[in-house]
Amino acid sequence: MIAGGPSAVIAELALSDALWRIVWLRDYNTRIVLLGTVLLGLAAGQLGVYLLLRRRVLIGDAISHATLPGVAIAFLWSVSLGQEKSLGLLLFGAAVSGALGGMVVLFLRHAAKIREDAALGIVLSVFFGAGVVMLSIAQQSGGNAAGLESFIYGKAAAMTSEDVWLCGAAAVLVFLITGLLGKELRILCFDTELARSQGWPVLLLDALLIGLVVVVTVVGLQAVGLILIIALLVTPASSARFWTHDLRLMLPLSAVLGAISCTAGTVASAMVEKLPSGAAIVLAACALFVVSFVFGIQRGVWWRLARMWELRRKQDEQHLLRAMVEHLEARAALPSLTGELKSSEPVELASLIQERNWPLHKVRRWVIRLSQKNLVILSGDGKLQLTPRGLLRAVEYVREHRLLERYLMERASAHASQADREADYLEHGLLPEHLAELSSALHENVPQLPPNPHPHDTEPPADSK
């Protein structure tokens, strides 16, 4: 028996039926809203990457707020002419007002030499303030002003087939322009001075980006509203950056994430009564951002911590192997590095720990990992021995370290102790080509194991003689 009685069963069945109606797109209005918002998400995600890389994110916010006075003025104009409220006229007014706001930003930044953040703040506050005043006047004008507030917060449920065609046209326009001008927009985003030096119209390209932002913003007024449209422009692009650094992959990934956000938000809004679609879409985009922030394979926190942990493990293992070679070298017990390599003589692990002042529990972990890799052998009496493979690896690490030390001491006039510390930081990221450059820079054929410029222990202890 299900807890809660018959009412709980009825509620559960109703919820299940509502979910399946959405999944199978049985309702015409659901199909319209879902298709329109998905097209909007694709366009916003694609365009948002260029805004993010161009550092023009806030200009989308300024333009979206600048559309409000255009909506109010278009409504007042239609009322003064004795006409009914027309969505096409309202969107046209929003487009003109948004474009004007974008041009004012460009004028203040280039002609008036005002900082971009100040120009954006001026346009956002002035235009939105004017829009609020005009919206109040429109609501008191006696005309049919009902529904104008939906342009602020969004109301996807009111979308029609004409709105879907509009979203589709906007998506096609965004993909067409960004595809045809992909090379120019990439250079504009990454190296503006290079684009300017090659004679490209940087200001015109900026204006084109602003124009696309106006188009996407105006189209998105119905779905998410002018306040939240900026989140749809920025959040999918920001999420995509956690997964890849390749712009060719980032663009489609951002578009797909935008579409997924719109799909999830629209479905949630359809299932939960009185849940605003705009807020639901933005929350879905934010949820994807959190997932990307944590698990993104390029910049996600989880993978960055994993890479840092792996690098730290590699550093510790290198330090232990290098310490063993230096310990054997100081006692003239290092095996011959020519011909067939043999295992090294055993090294007292306790003596090594005492020399380097390492914590015992950490050294035990290092030894276990190196033993699993067949680089060292730990005997029952606490002695550590390098295998032939481990000896070869350890000598490579010592050579890298000493090449760096010599380079820093000869070319940077660094003291031996300072060169040792700096080499500890740099050696773990060396590539074979870096080693070749170091050898060439020293103008001599460096032996396989260069001499130690500052041995930790130049003579064996008295009790070992």
Question: Model-flagged regions — what are they?
Answer:
Residues M1-G41:
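Membrane-interfacial amphipathic/re-entrant helices at transmembrane-helix boundaries
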Residues N29-G41, L87-A99, G168, V218-A231, ...:
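Structural signature of hydrophobic alpha-helical transmembrane segments
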Residues V49-S64, L68-G142, A240-S254, A268-S277:
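Short loop segments and helix-boundary regions at transmembrane helix junctions
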Residues L124-T178:
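Transmembrane helix-bundle core of multi-pass membrane transporters
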Residues T160-A231:
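Helix-loop-helix "hairpin" substructures at the membrane interface of multi-pass membrane proteins
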Residues I281-E326, P432-T458:
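Membrane-interfacial segments at transmembrane helix termini in multi-pass membrane proteins
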Residues W309-W358:
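Short amphipathic alpha-helical interface segments
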Residues L337-K465:
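Structured cytosolic domains appended to multi-pass membrane proteins
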